[in-house]
Amino acid sequence: INPSGIYVDVTYGGGGHSQEILKNLNSNGKLIAFDQDQDAIENKSNDSRLNLVKSNFKYLNNFLNYFKINEIDGLLADFGISSHQIDNKDRGFSTRFNSKLDMRMNSAQKIDAKTIVNDYDKDQLEYIFKNFGELRNYKKVTEKIISERAKRPIETTGDLKKILSPLVKVKDENKFL
């Protein structure tokens, strides 16, 4: 790391990676970090070298222009959900808890996982599970969800886990569910 460099963390999360970058920067160094999750924003390090932007990193170029930054020395991207999102039962990411089916990266977004599994049509669900979930058995998953939601709404992570468990090998449960 260049001690006086400019770095970007596009997935701030709990701030652990950003803290490591900041440890290696001198007073001239800068770190621009992005996160759309309010919990991450509230977890912000109080460091004048850090600009934490509450936004999706897809707007990276816009914000670099705003901060008048033409070149960066490095970029960190730790994609996926963060441990604090998994450990918070109210976020609805983990099947360790039976909680509301939420799973929003940004809790201010209107559409949650409950809406998706209960309201999206077959083609939309298949597209999501195939392309974002990278599931080989996306058609079976979709069929099972559509069949079960016809009986009653899928409300919780526990409901979803119960519905999908027959489709998952025990060794793959943590990866799949």
Model feature map: region roles:
Residues 1-177:
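S-adenosyl-L-methionine-dependent methyltransferase catalytic core, i.e., the SAM/SAH-binding region
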